[in-house]
Amino acid sequence: GFTPRGLVEMTLNLQALVNDLGADKVELHLIGHSAGSLINGHLIRLLWARHLPIATSTLMAPACTLDFANRTYRSVIEGGGLQRDDFHMHIMSDKREQDDNVIGVYHKSLLYLVSRSYEELQRMPLLGMAKSLDGAYQDFSDPKLSEWNIAAQDMTTQWNAFFWDNDVPAGFAATGSGLTHPRASTLHIYNDPKMTYGPHTKADTSHGGFDNDLNVMTTTLKNILGLDADARLDQPFIDLDY
């Protein structure tokens, strides 16, 4: 199988660091945006194979397939290398996905383009698409009407049974509303039409904007620090318009 040599070297260096400082002095926090979910998926599995637990994992608009997520994130979480409550995702609502564009040529989000054109299966469910996680879009009884390719049924069913603990909610994908507070505390669905990059800078919500948004990055840092959602950071993000 695929062996990401650079990530192997990174893992070995992290293992050496933990051995030098002591496991109680090192916390591993992973953050991945878009295709970064692929890098982190390989990395998280390599880390746990060497018994290095991950304190938190945060994905923003992850572009990996549900099959990949099953083989990496799910495998590590079920194996004890990462707690489910410390696995966070920031994604767009389906309304925002459909309002997004790719360089003004493709008039939906990058994830829609990848799902429908660039994967092994056309209409491949991707981890960062709200519809992939919504029970209302998991009816595979009629291949012509199904949201996803019929060949993706098993990966979709398996991931959602795991992710939702066998109780898959339905009807939230469009705007993100309808999830209970515990569920929305790890699946952060962005439905605001604008993202805030700085004190005087807003931009249309987009696939590429998550790591520029003050709210997303603040929430991510609070999760890493173990702070409550309403806590204030001593040194808050002020301007991420870069």
List the predicted regions and their residue ranges.
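Short, hydrophobic alpha-helix immediately C-terminal to the catalytic nucleophile
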Residues: 41-45
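Lipolytic serine-hydrolase domain surface
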Residues: 1-27, 46-240
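Gly/Ala-rich beta-loop-alpha elbow adjacent to hydrolase catalytic centers
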Residues: 31-36, 40
